Amino acid sequence: MSESVRTNTSIWSKGMLSVIVAQFLSAFGDNALLFATLALLKAQFYPDWSQPVLQMVFVGAYILFAPFVGQIADSFAKGRVMMVANGLKLAGAAGICLGINPFVGYTLVGIGAAAYSPAKYGILGELTTGDKLVKANGMMEASTIAAILLGSVAGGVLADWHVIAALVACALAYAGAVAANLFIPKLVAARPGQSWRLSAMTRSFFSACVVLWRNGETRFSLVGTGLFWGAGVTLRFLLVLWVPVALGITDNATPTYLNAMVAVGIVVGAGAAAKLVTLETVSRCMPAGILIGVVVAIFSLQHALLPAYALLLLIGMLGGFFVVPLNALLQERGKKSVGAGNAIAVQNLGENSAMLLMLGLYSLAVLVGVPAVAIGIGFGVLFALAIAALWIWQRRQASY
């Protein structure tokens, strides 16, 4: 394929639109499947502590395959990598529909998601460049946010009607993503012929980890984003447990509506951060991180739906304002030291490790019988203290 086809394609080309459609359907399936499978666990009388374990097996796949998925994406045509990854997601969702253990099926979806992540971002730079690339990234993020909102709500609403119907809808979304991938042009592999020795691949990946960890700015960013996304995924599961206790509502849809408010808030907060924070003033985002924990603690004490919606919207806004500058800092500094792709891969490992740790602690708290409201208050206070400690540590590092 010619270089002109690879780099000067319009963002409205068939290939680019196919990527965006595939991303929307794949992300829709991911978010709908989570809530549909949680509803299945409830219907089959799994214990409450098993709910976060479901996400832990998904996250575990990300961690296990982190050293390898970047090279896989670069060694083959990325559109085909995306298609195979969505095929794995389809197989996992279909398996759950057909009665296999939901944890086994969800693990398969996690493996597909781990392989899909570096390919979906990497292909944008192969389909377009320059200002068009910025717009393409914007389209990708917009489709992802839309999929999170619609997928989360659809999963909960459909599960209230019929759990199997909700699971079938997820499988159909993944099938649509596979079909959309077929319309992506088969581009030349970015880095073919790399060594497939597992020891060499692992050493290369962890070498990048060491480089980023030794740099004060990138270490600060890795810890901050890890804490944020670990807290975010834990909050998702806390809402499922908290809603029946605090609000007396037992359906599957209400937690998804509340989660959607967080996503809307993140969009607003991210926009504010883009205007108010630069790489030189990243520390401006830290008070927002501390306030996230404070507001989570206040939210946990609510017993009415309207203030719950308002506080979750505020949590999302604070979250978007907090995490976007940290992401930008890591991408900019990481690009110069280990390359943008390696920086993102290391960040994914850090974020998913934090998710695994926080979900494990949350599962343990539920297992020993800590009330949902108490978990929420403790979670908020600990998060605020962790971000405050990170801020103090960063200021001391900067003064040396």
UniProtKB/Swiss-Prot annotation:
Membrane topology summary: Multi-pass membrane protein
Localization, UniProt: Cell inner membrane
Chain segments annotated as transmembrane: 19-39, 53-73, 91-111, 139-159, 164-184, 195-213, 227-247, 257-277, 281-301, 304-324, 352-372, 373-393
Annotated GO CC locations: plasma membrane
Predominant subcellular localization, coarse grouping: membrane
InterPro entries per record: LysoPLipid__transptr_LplT (IPR023727), MFS (IPR011701), MFS_trans_sf (IPR036259)
Molecular function in Gene Ontology: lysophospholipid:sodium symporter activity
Keywords: Cell inner membrane, Cell membrane, Lipid transport, Membrane, Transmembrane, Transmembrane helix, Transport
Alphabetical list of CDD domains matching this protein: MFS_MefA_like
SUPFAM superfamilies: MFS general substrate transporter
Domain of life: Bacteria
Record's function text: Catalyzes the facilitated diffusion of 2-acyl-glycero-3-phosphoethanolamine (2-acyl-GPE) into the cell.
Protein family (similarity comment): Belongs to the major facilitator superfamily. LplT (TC 2.A.1.42) family.
NCBIfam families reported for this sequence: PRK11195.1
Protein name: Lysophospholipid transporter LplT
Lineage, top ranks: Bacteria, Pseudomonadati, Pseudomonadota, Gammaproteobacteria, Enterobacterales
